[in-house]
């Protein structure tokens, strides 16, 4: 049996989903493509997409969660390739104050979202 799957989405749990949405819109150009709210208001799922692929980033907000999430020591991250002038994009992210790691020898950097998740930025 050959399974021909494709990636659909990746999830980040967030404390302040409106703030997170604004960061993903401004820093990465993602747009909200879908939202699901529990009938009892206990959670909200917001799916952010790039408009080019069907892959989405699912932001999950849990009403009763008050303390920051423990992201552990796992070195997992998302990576986004950006078109255009890479140096200009990096300067924009530095101006936003969201660059959390930079390795100029390797030609890459990471930004952090409001909950501490890392997103690698590479040229297209």
Model-predicted segments: where are they?
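Short, charged/polar, Gly/Pro-enriched secondary-structure boundary elements
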Residues: 52-57, 116-120
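Vicinal oxygen chelate
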Residues: 15-18, 71-118, 123-124
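Core segments of cupin and vicinal oxygen chelate
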Residues: 11-54
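Short, charged/polar surface micro-motifs in flexible loops or helix N-caps
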Residues: 51-55, 64-66, 85-87
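Residues that flank catalytic or metal-binding motifs in active/ligand-binding sites
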Residues: 6, 44, 53-55, 74-76, ...
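N-terminal beta-strand motif that seeds the catalytic metal site of vicinal oxygen chelate
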Residues: 1-21, 75-78
